[in-house]
């Protein structure tokens, strides 16, 4: 809707209190009230107002039809949109509507002339607001001369404010000069000040002239002080700008003079220009040269006092500190490299062979790109230290950073330069620190990468570890291609389960298994003991360790896959000796087994009760964990119930399925449903607080259930691992070496394992298998024959015994005429394994 034309109304702008018509006779006793936000309108001012559509616009229409007088009141709380009688002040200003125009949105634009103050006495109507009002008389409050002096002071201070405040227009200055009455002068000055809403209202409510002028003088003085401070700030800023401009022109003149004389004084600029020349001589990527040229040009014009100057300088400093030169051709000595690797680490032949292979290829072909190795193994087996030794053997610098728990992609690829305090990522930082393009970078704990809201660091590593992409690696901060293809990346992990398949595809995996006792003894004698003595300052005292004491220390105080715990207990022992040395007390020169309890207390580990399947319903399994191998005792017990199986011990989904398969197979094997009717099998795997999962406990669960059903305990000394199917097949498993090491550590020397893992067994070094007996099986019938006596086997259904005749090796098959002792069986099995290996 379009607004109509302005409707001229009776003009009462000239009404004065001393006019012929008494003012009180013209002003109505009741007024429509229009609420106003932010600041009130003072008497004696002509001003436009926009009244929104609705009840107030209708009130304006009613007023125009009547006497054209409105009451303007200030809202107390602007956030409270309810324009009620409780939300308006008691004092306001009566105004005469001079002109009105209707707006398209049904709102009304009015031009009003404010006349005098009024006070709300009572409300006649609250929707719309109509109030009965009174018009208080203005009281001098002071003698005439005092009022006159106060008015002059007000005029002088207002002129001072007008001179310093550019917001004062000429019209406002003229209006100020033409106002002669003190009350109107005070109202006018207050209306042009920038005050709080409550301060405005306090002036509106002042009927005593002296009080009103005093309030306005106080507000005016505050405003003058504020304007003065603003002027000082403005002058300071202007002076600073003028100074910067002057310095800029002087620097430009100085540069022009220096160029004429051939003198360069800016050390940073000289350094960056040399860097640019270096890039050009190296035939660097044109994109890099172009970017450095552009940044150097910006740097030459930047003001040192600005933030841009430091941003550009930091960027150029980082670029200048990177190794842009090609990787040097290093002299490779394989024998020296092998000695370096052997010096710090015992065994680890797979890792050492891979490094020597890489060096041999590098020697034959100089353009061999960087290699990415992934060392996987339990804690304490030397993954981090072997990486450091690799760098030493190759003659390269070494840089390590942990990615465990990293959640931000920018940690790898850097932050973009738009952010305050941005820096390059870890990869570029490593190259800056090492100053080598072919350094060795260790990504520690890569299996513990996390995903956060800032991105996926594992995905960022895909580009870093891809030989086809990292030739033009782009860090977010540099935003330039940089060749990292010559970097030798080594990653470490405890397990592969949490690493993405795509990331694993880019790395060559080398498994580091846990150490057996013999290996730990060698490590202790060759490396660990000397290190701990030196660390605690007792090397000069020539303390030695008896070999039997070393074995006892390993078995009784630090039973683990690695040697980190062994180092800790050894460190504790040597500290005890250090106290005796300082106190000048006697101490053993050779540590014997009997001395361990004196220095270290009661042994933490004894012969494990857990590894002894000593009652019916128990069997010992072998498990693999992220911290190495472990033994796993499985217990079975009949309890009252409606059949089925109850599982405890924090077993995962896979082990739960394995237990159901084992129960179904044994039920079918025994062919005696009455054994399981109205009884439930409770299967428990200690310890209950440790989560467990995996498929390799199938034959162990079946053996525990079979032992329970036959009420016969399994033969002692056996540990087993293998996945079981419903038809009795025994399937391959993983982590065989770790399981063998765990069994050997606790005194288990007879291992039942899947025949499909025979190849893996042959790859395990002989010193690990020394003193062990291995029994490969392909079906569960072979497992049962090993674990139970022939009399017990005869209790099983005929079909089971028939299967034994066709499956079991003749050296171990049942025969009533020719009995073979258990010792002979084990000897024959061991001989068979050796013959297969020779073949």
Curated annotation (Swiss-Prot):
<feature type="domain" description="Lon proteolytic">
    <location>
        <begin position="613"/>
        <end position="790"/>
    </location>
</feature>
<comment type="similarity">
    <text>Belongs to the peptidase S16 family.</text>
</comment>
<comment type="subunit">
    <text>Homohexamer. Organized in a ring with a central cavity.</text>
</comment>
<feature type="compositionally biased region" description="Low complexity">
    <location>
        <begin position="823"/>
        <end position="832"/>
    </location>
</feature>
<dbReference type="GO" id="GO:0004176">
    <property type="term" value="F:ATP-dependent peptidase activity"/>
</dbReference>
<feature type="active site">
    <location>
        <position position="739"/>
    </location>
</feature>
<dbReference type="InterPro" id="IPR015947">
    <property type="entry name" value="PUA-like_sf"/>
</dbReference>
<dbReference type="GO" id="GO:0016887">
    <property type="term" value="F:ATP hydrolysis activity"/>
</dbReference>
<dbReference type="InterPro" id="IPR027417">
    <property type="entry name" value="P-loop_NTPase"/>
</dbReference>
<dbReference type="GO" id="GO:0034605">
    <property type="term" value="P:cellular response to heat"/>
</dbReference>
<keyword id="KW-0963">Cytoplasm</keyword>
<dbReference type="InterPro" id="IPR003959">
    <property type="entry name" value="ATPase_AAA_core"/>
</dbReference>
<keyword id="KW-0547">Nucleotide-binding</keyword>
<feature type="active site">
    <location>
        <position position="696"/>
    </location>
</feature>
<comment type="function">
    <text>ATP-dependent serine protease that mediates the selective degradation of mutant and abnormal proteins as well as certain short-lived regulatory proteins. Required for cellular homeostasis and for survival from DNA damage and developmental changes induced by stress. Degrades polypeptides processively to yield small peptide fragments that are 5 to 10 amino acids long. Binds to DNA in a double-stranded, site-specific manner.</text>
</comment>
<feature type="domain" description="Lon N-terminal">
    <location>
        <begin position="31"/>
        <end position="224"/>
    </location>
</feature>
<dbReference type="InterPro" id="IPR008269">
    <property type="entry name" value="Lon_proteolytic"/>
</dbReference>
<feature type="binding site">
    <location>
        <begin position="377"/>
        <end position="384"/>
    </location>
    <ligand>
        <name>ATP</name>
    </ligand>
</feature>
<dbReference type="GO" id="GO:0004252">
    <property type="term" value="F:serine-type endopeptidase activity"/>
</dbReference>
<dbReference type="GO" id="GO:0005524">
    <property type="term" value="F:ATP binding"/>
</dbReference>
<dbReference type="Pfam" id="PF00004">
    <property type="entry name" value="AAA"/>
</dbReference>
<dbReference type="InterPro" id="IPR003593">
    <property type="entry name" value="AAA+_ATPase"/>
</dbReference>
<keyword id="KW-0067">ATP-binding</keyword>
<dbReference type="GO" id="GO:0006515">
    <property type="term" value="P:protein quality control for misfolded or incompletely synthesized proteins"/>
</dbReference>
<keyword id="KW-0720">Serine protease</keyword>
<feature type="region of interest" description="Disordered">
    <location>
        <begin position="807"/>
        <end position="839"/>
    </location>
</feature>
<dbReference type="InterPro" id="IPR054594">
    <property type="entry name" value="Lon_lid"/>
</dbReference>
<dbReference type="InterPro" id="IPR027543">
    <property type="entry name" value="Lon_bac"/>
</dbReference>
<dbReference type="Pfam" id="PF02190">
    <property type="entry name" value="LON_substr_bdg"/>
</dbReference>
<keyword id="KW-0378">Hydrolase</keyword>
<dbReference type="Pfam" id="PF22667">
    <property type="entry name" value="Lon_lid"/>
</dbReference>
<protein>
    <recommendedName>
        <fullName>Lon protease</fullName>
        <ecNumber>3.4.21.53</ecNumber>
    </recommendedName>
</protein>
<dbReference type="InterPro" id="IPR004815">
    <property type="entry name" value="Lon_bac/euk-typ"/>
</dbReference>
<dbReference type="InterPro" id="IPR046336">
    <property type="entry name" value="Lon_prtase_N_sf"/>
</dbReference>
<dbReference type="InterPro" id="IPR003111">
    <property type="entry name" value="Lon_prtase_N"/>
</dbReference>
<keyword id="KW-0346">Stress response</keyword>
<keyword id="KW-0645">Protease</keyword>
<dbReference type="InterPro" id="IPR014721">
    <property type="entry name" value="Ribsml_uS5_D2-typ_fold_subgr"/>
</dbReference>
<dbReference type="InterPro" id="IPR020568">
    <property type="entry name" value="Ribosomal_Su5_D2-typ_SF"/>
</dbReference>
<dbReference type="InterPro" id="IPR008268">
    <property type="entry name" value="Peptidase_S16_AS"/>
</dbReference>
<dbReference type="GO" id="GO:0043565">
    <property type="term" value="F:sequence-specific DNA binding"/>
</dbReference>
<dbReference type="Pfam" id="PF05362">
    <property type="entry name" value="Lon_C"/>
</dbReference>
């Amino acid at each position: 809707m379009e607004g109509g034309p302005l409707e001229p109304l009776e003009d009462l702008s000239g009404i004065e209190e001393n006019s012929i018509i008494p003012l009180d006779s013209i002003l109505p006793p009741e007024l429509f009230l229009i609420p106003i936000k932010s600041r009130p309108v003072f008497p004696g001012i002509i001003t436009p107002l926009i009244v929104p559509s609705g009840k107030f616009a209708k009130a304006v229409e009613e007023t125009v039809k009547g006497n054209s007088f409105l009451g303007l009141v200030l809202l107390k709380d602007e956030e409270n949109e309810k324009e009620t009688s409780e939300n308006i002040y008691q004092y306001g200003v009566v105004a005469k509507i001079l002109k009105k125009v209707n707006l398209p949105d049904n709102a009304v634009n009015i031009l009003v002339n404010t006349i005098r103050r009024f006070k709300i006495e009572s409300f006649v109507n609250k929707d719309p607001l109509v109030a009965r009002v009174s018009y208080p008389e203005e009281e001098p409050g002071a003698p005439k001369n005092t009022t006159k002096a106060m008015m002059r002071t007000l005029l002088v201070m207002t002129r001072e404010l007008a001179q310093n405040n550019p917001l004062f227009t000429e019209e406002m200055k003229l209006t100020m000069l033409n106002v002669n009455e003190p009350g109107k002068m005070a109202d006018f000055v207050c209306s042009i000040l920038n005050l709080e809403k409550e301060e405005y209202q306090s002036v509106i409510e002042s009927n005593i002239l002296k009080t009103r002028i005093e309030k306005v003088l106080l507000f005016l003085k505050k405003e003058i002080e504020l304007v003065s401070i603003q002027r000082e700030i403005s002058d300071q800023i202007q002076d600073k700008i003028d100074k910067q401009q002057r310095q800029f022109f002087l620097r430009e003149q100085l540069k022009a003079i220096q160029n004429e004389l051939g003198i360069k004084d800016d050390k940073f600029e000289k350094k960056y220009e040399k860097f640019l020349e270096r890039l050009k001589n190296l035939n660097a990527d044109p994109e890099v040269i172009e970017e450095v040229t552009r940044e150097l040009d910006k740097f030459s014009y930047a003001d040192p006092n600005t933030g841009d100057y430091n941003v550009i300088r930091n960027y150029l400093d980082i670029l200048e500190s990177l190794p842009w030169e090609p990787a040097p051709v290093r002299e490779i000595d394989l024998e020296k490299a092998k000695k370096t690797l052997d010096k710090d680490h015992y065994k680890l032949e797979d890792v050492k062979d891979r490094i020597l292979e890489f060096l041999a290829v590098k020697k034959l072909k100089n353009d061999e790109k960087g290699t990415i190795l992934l060392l996987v193994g339990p804690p304490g087996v030397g993954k981090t230290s072997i990486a450091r030794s690799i760098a030493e053997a190759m003659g390269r610098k070494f840089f390590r950073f942990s990615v465990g728990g990293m959640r931000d992609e920018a940690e790898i690829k850097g932050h973009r330069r738009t952010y305050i305090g941005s820096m390059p990522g870890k990869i570029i930082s490593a190259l800056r620190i090492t100053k080598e393009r072919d350094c060795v970078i260790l990504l520690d704990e890569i299996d513990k990468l996390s995903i956060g809201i800032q991105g996926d660091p594992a995905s960022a590593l895909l580009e870093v570890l891809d030989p086809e992409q990292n030739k033009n690696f782009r860090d977010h901060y540099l935003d330039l291609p940089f060749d990292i293809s010559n970097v030798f990346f080594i990653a470490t992990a405890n397990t592969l389960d949490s690493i993405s398949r795509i990331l694993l595809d880019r790395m060559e995996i080398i498994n580091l298994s846990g150490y057996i006792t013999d290996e730990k003894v060698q490590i202790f004698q060759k490396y660990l003991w000397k290190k701990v003595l030196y660390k605690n300052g007792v090397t000069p005292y020539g303390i030695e360790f008896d070999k039997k004491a070393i074995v006892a220390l390993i078995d009784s105080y630090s039973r683990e896959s690695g040697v980190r715990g062994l180092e800790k207990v050894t460190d504790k022992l040597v500290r005890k000796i250090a106290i005796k040395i300082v106190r000048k007390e006697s101490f053993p020169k050779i540590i014997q087994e009997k001395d361990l309890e004196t220095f270290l207390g009661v042994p933490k580990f004894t012969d494990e009760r857990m590894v002894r399947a000593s009652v019916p319903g128990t069997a010992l399994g072998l498990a693999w964990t992220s911290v190495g191998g472990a033994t796993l005792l499985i217990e079975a017990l009949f309890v009252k119930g409606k059949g089925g199986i109850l599982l405890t011990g924090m077993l995962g989904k896979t082990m739960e399925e394995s237990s159901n398969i084992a129960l179904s197979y044994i039920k079918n094997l025994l062919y005696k449903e009455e054994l399981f009717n109205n009884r439930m099998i409770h299967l428990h795997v200690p310890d209950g607080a440790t989560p467990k999962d995996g498929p390799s406990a199938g034959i162990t669960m079946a053996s525990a259930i079979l032992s329970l059903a036959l009420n016969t305990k399994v033969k002692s000394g056996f540990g087993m691992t293998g996945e079981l199917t419903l038809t009795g097949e025994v399937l391959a498993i993983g982590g065989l070496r770790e399981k063998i090491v765990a069994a050997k550590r606790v005194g288990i020397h007879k291992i039942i394992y899947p025949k499909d893992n025979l190849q893996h067994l042959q790859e395990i070094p002989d010193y690990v298998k020394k003193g062990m007996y291995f029994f490969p099986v392909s079906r569960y019938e072979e497992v049962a024959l090993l674990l139970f006596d022939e009399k017990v086997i005869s209790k099983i259904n005929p079909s089971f015994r028939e299967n034994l005749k066709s499956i079991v090796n003749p050296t171990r098959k049942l025969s009533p005429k020719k009995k073979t002792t258990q010792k002979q069986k084990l000897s024959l099995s061991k001989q068979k394994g050796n013959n297969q290996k020779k073949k």
